[in-house]
Amino acid sequence: MSREDLSIAEDLNQVSKPLLKVKLLEVLGQGDFKHLKALVDNEFQPKDDPSVQQVLNLILHYAVQVAPILLIKEIVAHWVDQVGDEKSSSKSDDGIHLDLNYQDENGNTPLHLAAAQSRSDVISFLLSQKSINDCVKNKAHQQPLDMCKDLNVAQMIQLKRDDYFLETVHSLRAAMNKRDFSKLDSIWKNPRNLNLLDINGIDPETGTTLLYEYSQKKDIEMCQWLLKHGAEATVKDGKGRSPLDLVKNIKLPAKPSNNVTPEIKLKNLLEKNLREQAIVHEDVASSKPPTYKGFLKKWTNFAHGYKLRWFILSGDGNLSYYKDQSHVDRPRGTLKVSTCRLHIDSSEKLNFELLGGITGTTRWRLKGNHPIETTRWVNAIQSAIRFAKDKEILNKKKAVPPSLALKNKSPALISHSKTQGSLPEASQYYQHTLHKEVIQPSSVSLYRRPSNNLSVVSSEIQLNDNLTESGKRFVSKMIENRLDGSKTPVGVHTGSALQRVRSSNTLKSNRSMQSGSGVASPIDKVPNGANLSQSNTTTGSTASLSDNNYIDNFEGDEANSDDEEEDLGINFDRDEEYIKAQYGPYKEKLDMYEQAISIELSSLIELIEQEEPSPEVWLTIKKSLINTSTIFGKLKDLTYKRDKRLVDMVSKQGDVNNVWVQSVKELEMELSNKTERLASIDKERRGLKKILHKKLLESHATAGNKESLENDKEQESDTTASTLGQIAKFISATKEEDEASDADEFYDAAELVDEVTELTEAHPEISTAAAPKHAPPPVPNETDNDSQYVQDEKSKIESNVEKTSQKFEKQNNLVTEDEPKTDQSLKNFKAEDKESQVKEKTKEIASSVIGEKTIVAVTTVQKRKEEYLLKEGSYLGYEDGIRKRLSMDKDDRPKISLWAVLKSMVGKDMTRMTLPVTFNEPTSLLQRVAEDLEYSELLDQAATFEDSTLRTLYVAAFTASSYASTTKRVAKPFNPLLGETFEYSRPDKQYRFFTEQVSHHPPISATWTESPRWDFWGESFVDTKFNGRSFNVKHLGLWHIKLRPNDNEKEELYTWKKPNNTVIGILIGNPQVDNHGEVNVVNHTTGDHCKLYFKARGWRSSGAYEITGEVYNKKKQKVWILGGHWNEAIFAKKVVKDGDLSLEKTRTAASAGNGPTDDGTKFLIWKANDRPEEPFNLTPFAITLNAPQPHLLPWLPPTDTRLRPDQRAMEDGRYDEAGDEKFRVEEKQRAARRKREENNLEYHPQWFVRDTHPITKAKYWRYTGKYWVKRRDHDLKDCGDIF
């Protein structure tokens, strides 16, 4: 026979691998082991053929993807060898021996593929096999757990691995106690155990390593076994002791002797190990930062509870979390561990908290799936915190901290670190890899086996200042408490001193890898974006806010932020049906059918491409296509059933939600109706009391003429007596309610304001009475008709303002098409004359607006400040006066249900909400800050008083007065863009205001206001949440006032934090603003302080808007008390005796216009301005803020809020354009942020810097002093392009 004939014969006899795969898939889909065995016996011949062997080895790989669980169990029972099964080698009589951990071309084991398809029944069965190894990594460096898409399955794998670990540790300790070395060897030979156990771990019960324990017992044989299997003599225990310390004082004999003591043997053994380790690991010292990854449950909100999330602690010190492993390119949140501290409750075995962020307000409530897992995470995070702190020390002082010294190769550094008391954490004993980066024992880092994997160095694991006190107590007791609730038998923890330190590389790119075996590995389906490296784990998504620099470097904006993750992920406390709805019913079967079709078709293509079709091949192809068609039919039917079930579940859930919403709405309506009814009753009661009071006064007035009028008034007296009797009866009936009301402790503001008005009308001389003897002539208040200010001066001011306003009334205070030219005289100033001419020009503008000056600088510091404001041209451009009205007459925004939009945003931060533009008002949050200055006259008046406690009283009234403008203002202001600014000067009130948005996430506005008598600055920094029924706003920023009193040259510093705000009544469509909480206004110069109490809205309307307070001197004595309503008026009186500690019910003469009194009578401090009906419910003051006055526009920088297009369109009623512009400017902001991230640039504010206040020692935003100078010089054109 020729060679050509032999070649043809060989080709005919060669086994077709694609044909075998197609036939195998057909049989696996039938689920009958007898058919599978017949196929293998008849078709898979000869057994030694390479193609046959390849397909045989992959039987289990195909089975876990397309076969039912019963067939998989039979395959394992008949063909898979088990560890420790003596019959396993002989149970297969056909010579087939499958490896449960065999890896295909992509490195996937059957467990990998089952995990990728989330086949929980298959995974549970495989993990129950003795020979399984769930720590094997594929070529993408993923363990089976890393490939799970179903979070339920991932949690199951975690729990099973933890249970196996505890069981193995218990067995290992039992074998050690029995000195069963054969059992120890068998345990240690298991590859899975090598990945999970660390022989150098610390026993939590004894606090020592195994080698130290048996060295102390002088058990030479056991020490030899431990050293042979990787124990190291240099590893220190929980008290900083190593086995070498036990033998360091033993002296070796000068000459060898046959009579060697156990101590000498032990010393020789340990020193030999030390020499070997020094040689083997000479270059293995590790100084890599701690890394870790895995699943944890994170608390989101009350609506969704805990959700399982994928966490990664990266080497750059960032802890980030993701929805799952496939979304590692989109972190939902990031914390810099160097700014964090751990809080752990020793009574909790699974929960711990991470408190962090520069403000200390970030709070992550985390929960492990198992006590051991929680322990590992606690140690990993604590290790990372210590590493970051030590790195900072190293960078600043160029010194090696103790925790980093252990990583140095020099043995001298080991002893040094010991003297420094750098002790490892006892609880690191439980560290074993769980698909994660895992912690290394601290002392082992010097002599660790070489590894290409990223490892966690835990020399930092020790009690440190980053743990709270309860956390430190917990770490000390962690071991004894941690396993109490586990199902492991008692005594297991006594031997769990073994953990192999292993680590897995961070996730790499999971690009498609075509398997030559034809196994359609689900790893091919992982998105290409899942690429995470050590260097760029969280680049571009880190919210890193250092003390000295707030930066805009956060992934989320209000249009794409989802870190509160509502409606995402799984809450494992819910019922099974709801969990299935998240993934979809019949998911496992659908995945199996899809995978079967995919593999079948790929195998057919491979068969057609590689074979010349023969009759047998065509028959196989036909059967395969029929089988594929059958599977597709099942897939179609099951998909229809799934969709129908999902629709039913969604409809049912929608009905449940509607019932819930309707129930809550009805409850809100009922509460609202009761509140209105109580309010009407209360008003009626007050009216009757007023009638009674009036009748009594009339009866006293006519008492002198009683005799002469007795006959004429007899009938009227009877009527009066009858009326008074009825009134008295009504008042008696409501007496209990009246006495129970806290509101009656103080004057009702509305009632007393009416009384003051009546007094003023009846006695005009009150308004022109002399000022109190302890105060100089006060500053005019243009808004208070009942004040004590001089009437003719006030008339003069109003007259001048009115003239100036009428000058531009024809323009309706809007921008004209012909923009006025900038005053050329200012542009042509000579350098030497510029400041003086600017000063004169500023005086001229102020004079044109207010006429004769009404606020006179008295002291040197006041005059110096006034000169400073004039020199910098603070009022240039404000010649036009203030705007009195908007361009539109009424608010004609489209009506949209607020609840319909907000119901999907429960639990979210308000600043991250994306709402339709119609829910906005045409103001910015920067302008909302400016509204605090509406009643700045209170500060001017405070500076006139000699008494420091009285100054404190008026400053406190100023802090409360700003909330009068919040009533009816429930629309959302525009969120400022990063770098956006706003200026506002009032020549008539002699102050200038400036603010800048210095941070976007979190949103922070820094502000600075200056006036001759006072300065006002602070930061608008709030934490906001929507809980379904109300918006909650918590103010975090500290506010400051520097007052310059008229009576001395010493300035006074006041600070306070604003009360909390709540918007209620959202469900019933009647939103209202409520302010509540305690405010402490502190005078740091004199030691005086005022406590203000904003009362939360209760059942009765008389309790709404209520405010009370007390002023104390530096001796802690109460000097003044105040009360009223923050939306109407505030009154006060002086405490003249010990028992006079509140504003009592008894009416006394109220001073309407004379200001403070010292005799204990009540006087009016402040009264709110009138609120006429205006579009968007804006106040008259708010209307002035966004006015594009013609003379002002040329002076403004391009970042000023008045030039913002979306807000301007909103003000003019162009709502569609406003929405489009809002989207455009926010996209522009995001593009700028991405550009900064690409270039590794940090954002720095232009006009403010983060600093520490010399008096309060608190961080604050300090104004650099450059804005008004550049404005005066027309040097603001290049300050930024943000609109």
From Swiss-Prot:
Annotated motif FFAT, positions: 745-751
Main localisation: membrane
Annotated protein name in UniProt: Oxysterol-binding protein homolog 2
Functional summary from the UniProt entry: Lipid transport protein (LTP) involved in non-vesicular transfer of lipids between membranes. Functions in phosphoinositide-coupled directional transport of various lipids by carrying the lipid molecule in a hydrophobic pocket and transferring it between membranes through the cytosol. Involved in maintenance of intracellular sterol distribution and homeostasis. Binds and transports sterol. Plays a role in the positive regulation of vesicular transport of ceramide from the ER to the Golgi, negatively regulating COPII-mediated ER export of cargos.
GO BP: endocytosis; ER to Golgi ceramide transport; exocytosis; maintenance of cell polarity; piecemeal microautophagy of the nucleus; reticulophagy; sterol transport
One GO location term (cellular component): endoplasmic reticulum membrane
Pfam families found in the cross-reference section: Ank_4, Oxysterol_BP, PH
Additional facts recorded: Present with 1069 molecules/cell in log phase SD medium.
PROSITE patterns: ANK_REP_REGION, ANK_REPEAT, OSBP, PH_DOMAIN
Keywords (A to Z) from UniProt: Acetylation, ANK repeat, Cell membrane, Endoplasmic reticulum, Lipid transport, Lipid-binding, Membrane, Phosphoprotein, Repeat, Transport
ANK repeats: 106-134, 206-235
Assembly and interaction partners: Interacts with SCS2.
Positions of modified residues (N-acetylserine): 2
Stretches for region Disordered: 504-571, 702-721, 767-834
Membrane topology value: Peripheral membrane protein
Subcellular location: Cell membrane; Endoplasmic reticulum membrane
InterPro entries in UniProt: Ankyrin_rpt (IPR002110), Ankyrin_rpt-contain_sf (IPR036770), OSBP_sf (IPR037239), Oxysterol-bd (IPR000648), Oxysterol-bd_CS (IPR018494), PH-like_dom_sf (IPR011993), PH_domain (IPR001849)
Molecular function terms from GO: lipid binding; sterol binding; sterol transfer activity
Classification via Gene3D superfamilies: 2.40.160.120, 3.30.70.3490, Ankyrin repeat-containing domain, Pleckstrin-homology domain (PH domain)/Phosphotyrosine-binding domain (PTB)
Phosphothreonine PTM sites in chain numbering: 488, 783
Stretch list, region OSBP-related domain (ORD): 897-1268
